[in-house]
Amino acid sequence: MSGLQSHILNESIGESREIKEYNALPEITLESLKERLQRDCNEPITSLGQFPDPLLFKGMKEALDIFIWAVSNNKRILCILDSDCDGVGTFITSIEFFKYFGYQNVEFLIVKRHEGYGFIPKHITDRQIKPDVIITADNGITAHAATELATQMGIYTIITDHHQPNYKGVPKASAVIDPHQPGCTFPFKDINGTVVVWYFYWAIAQRLNLNFKNHWYEMMAPELTLTTIADVIKLQGLSRFLVKDGLKKFYTSSRNWVKVFMEDRKEVDAEALAFGLIPCINVAARLADATHAANFLVSPTYQIAKEWYKYLKQLNDHRKEKQELLDKEISNTYPAWLEHPFI
C-alpha cells in the first residue's frame, strides 16, 4: 500500500496629450495611462497564504472524487502531457507528486509532436492495457473525440488545461479543470498548464488534510516560474507572484537542472530563461524527443543534468544553423519577399 493510499484510508511619460484628431480612438490622458499601468502591475498576491483556494476551480471537486476513488482501489492512471516547455513542466510536476506520495500504478505519456496536438484517440487504442483514469495536463480542452471514446470504454477522464475551449465547447469529460471554461470562479485566468495541474495536486493533499502547500510550492517553484515565462503568460496576480518570487528560488534551489543553469550566472531574470534556457527545452520536441528535455529537468545528479544541458544546447545550436540556412535559401530564391511590408 502506497503512502497516498494510506492517507486516503485515514482521510518617461510626458505631459498629457489629447488625441482628438482621431475620432476612432479614445482620449488618452496621462492619468488614464497611470491607472492602466497601476492596474497591470497590481499585486494582489504577495505571499503563498494569499493563493486562491483550489476549490474555486469549476470541476475540482469532481476531479478529486475520481482521483481519491482511483488510488483507493489501486486503479491504473495514465497522465497525458503536452511536449512544449509548459507540457514538460506538467510532466515534472506530475512525476514529483506521485513519487512524493509513493503511488506507482501510474504511467506518463508526453505527446509526440508528429502525432498532432494533445489527447487523441490513438493514445487509448494503441495501449495494450487500458487505463482506468486519464489525466491530461496542458491539453485536453479541445479533445472531444478522445474524451468521447474514453467514456465509451468506461475510462474516467480528468482534463486539466489552461487553453480556451474551441467552438464545440467543453468536452464531456468526467471532470474539467480549466479557468476559461464557463462558470469557473477561479479569479486568475492568465495561468499556464503547469500551474493548473500543480493546483490539482495541491487540492488532493488538501482533501486529505495534509499540510502540503508550503512544501509543494518550494519544491516546484522553479518549474512554475520557468513555464509561466515560457508560455508568455500575462504577469498579473498569481502569475506575477510566481515569476517574481520564483526567480528568487533559483539561488537556493536544490534542483540539479537549476544548479547547472546557474553555474556560470551571478543572477537570473526572465530574459535569461526566455532566451537562454526555454529554447533549449522546446527544441527537444521539435528536433528529437520531448523526453530529452524532461530527463534534464528530473536529473537525479548534477553531472547527469550537466550532460543533458550540454546536449540540449547543442541541439538548439543545430536548430539555429538550420534556420539560418533556410532564411538564406529563401532570400536567394525569393528576394522580393523580404521587401514585402508584411514579412
Please provide the spans of the model-predicted regions.
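Non-catalytic nucleic-acid-binding interfaces of large nucleic-acid enzymes and RNP effectors
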Residues: 3
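Short, ordered loop/turn segments at secondary-structure junctions
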Residues: 82-83, 111-113, 139-140, 162-165, ...
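Hydrophobic helix-and-loop "lid/oligomerization" segment in the mid-to-C-terminal part
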Residues: 7-133, 153, 206-343
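Hydrophobic/aromatic beta-strand patches that form the interior of the parallel beta-sheet core
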Residues: 135, 156-160, 175-177, 224
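Catalytic PLP-binding core of fold-type I/II PLP enzymes
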Residues: 148-160, 164-166, 232
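Short, glycine/polar-rich helix-capping loops at beta-to-alpha or helix-loop-helix junctions
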Residues: 122, 162-172
